[in-house]
From Swiss-Prot:
Encoding gene per record: C
One MF term in the entry's GO annotations: DNA binding
Cited function: Self assembles to form an icosahedral capsid. Most capsids appear to be large particles with an icosahedral symmetry of T=4 and consist of 240 copies of capsid protein, though a fraction forms smaller T=3 particles consisting of 180 capsid proteins. Entering capsids are transported along microtubules to the nucleus. Phosphorylation of the capsid is thought to induce exposure of nuclear localization signal in the C-terminal portion of the capsid protein that allows binding to the nuclear pore complex via the importin (karyopherin-) alpha and beta.
UniProt subunit comment: Homodimerizes, then multimerizes. Interacts with cytosol exposed regions of viral L glycoprotein present in the reticulum-to-Golgi compartment. Interacts with human FLNB. Phosphorylated form interacts with host importin alpha; this interaction depends on the exposure of the NLS, which itself depends upon genome maturation and/or phosphorylation of the capsid protein. Interacts with host NUP153.
Name of the molecule in the record: Capsid protein
Presence of the UniProt keyword RNA-binding in the record: yes
One BP annotation, GO: microtubule-dependent intracellular transport of viral material towards nucleus
Comp. bias intervals (Basic residues): 149-176
Origin superkingdom: Viruses
GO cellular component, one term: T=4 icosahedral viral capsid
Location(s) in or outside the cell: Virion; Host cytoplasm
Sequence repeats (start-end): 155-161, 162-169, 170-177
């Protein structure tokens, strides 16, 4: 079977392949980021989003791969064979897991549309001959600030800003903080 884990999210393995392997942070850094930002939602029994589900699955797969690597390390007698297996897991499987973790963490952090736009921008940039492209590659975290997307049928923005509304002098009521997971 030819299964593309990014297909339902509007991306593809090919689109992510434009990013060099050293672009992706280490698995440890990605796991720490996922935990710091999304731990409550990832551990929740509630369904938050397809990205949360995919992130859970990638984290579980990596855990199982580490169990396999530990087992191989303990049970394979030949050091050369053991090194080959561990190296294969780290290089090939590690890259795929790093890509998955990066993609879903980025989609949750920046939004799917922004991440897809970044992947396309980077793909165009990397395929453009160096003499004809900007010196620096696109940067994901700056896309929301610099990208202007105009929808069809909308009138262009007015040139003069509307007058500011006077703010109420009374303090704003805060929403009660619930203990439910933040998705």
């Amino acid at each position: 079977m030819d299964i593309d884990p990014y297909k339902e999210f509007g991306a593809s393995v090919e689109l992510l392949s434009f990013l060099p392997s050293d672009f992706f942070p280490s698995i440890r850094d990605l796991l720490d980021t996922a935990s710091a930002l999304y731990r409550e939602a990832l551990e929740s029994p509630e369904h938050c989003s397809p990205h949360h589900t995919a992130l859970r699955q990638a984290i579980l797969c990596w855990g199982e791969l580490m169990n396999l690597a530990t087992w191989v390390g303990s049970n394979l007698e030949d050091p050369a064979s053991r090194e080959l297996v561990v190296s294969y897991v780290n290089v090939n499987m590690g890259l795929k897991i790093r890509q998955l973790l990066w993609f879903h963490i980025s989609c949750l952090t920046f939004g799917r549309e922004t991440v897809l736009e970044y992947l396309v921008s980077f793909g165009v940039w990397i395929r453009t001959p160096p003499a004809y492209r900007p010196q620096n590659a696109p940067i994901l975290s700056t896309l929301p600030e610099t990208t202007v997307v105009r929808r069809r049928g909308r009138s262009p923005r007015r040139r003069t800003p509307s007058p500011r509304r006077r703010r109420s002098q009374s303090p704003r009521r805060r929403r009660s903080q619930s203990r439910e997971p933040q998705c």
